[in-house]
Amino acid sequence: MAVKERVGVVVSDKMDKTVVVAIEDRTAHPKYGKIVVRTKRYKAHDEDNRAKTGDRVRIQETRPLSRTKRWTVAEILESVGA
């Protein structure tokens, strides 16, 4: 089975080895057709604390690492500081 991957923006890096990644999903409303933007936030494991707030990252699903953490940072796509 394929590994689930998502691309999103880091919105918080205040925890040790953990970042909060916001994933934006744009879908059409089933009845009215208007594009609705829904945001979901995932906690992701960042072993080296490399990701900073504002970075675009790719996260991968993994085994449960804590009560709320089931994703890990696979790579940093765009860094805000660089």
UniProtKB/Swiss-Prot annotation:
Disulfide bridge partners, by residue number: none
Entry's Gene Ontology BP terms: translation
CDD domains with a match to the protein in the record: Ribosomal_uS17
Molecular function terms, GO-annotated: rRNA binding; structural constituent of ribosome
Superkingdom: Bacteria
Pfam family, one: Ribosomal_S17
InterPro entries: NA-bd_OB-fold (IPR012340), Ribosomal_uS17 (IPR000266), Ribosomal_uS17_bact/chlr (IPR019984), Ribosomal_uS17_CS (IPR019979)
Keyword annotations: Ribonucleoprotein, Ribosomal protein, RNA-binding, rRNA-binding
Amino-acid biosynthesis is among the record's keywords: no
GO cellular component, one term: cytosolic small ribosomal subunit
Quaternary organization: Part of the 30S ribosomal subunit.
Family: Belongs to the universal ribosomal protein uS17 family.
Role played: One of the primary rRNA binding proteins, it binds specifically to the 5'-end of 16S ribosomal RNA.
Official protein name in the record: Small ribosomal subunit protein uS17
Source organism: Synechococcus elongatus (strain ATCC 33912 / PCC 7942 / FACHB-805) (Anacystis nidulans R2)
Lineage per the UniProt record: Bacteria, Bacillati, Cyanobacteriota, Cyanophyceae, Synechococcales
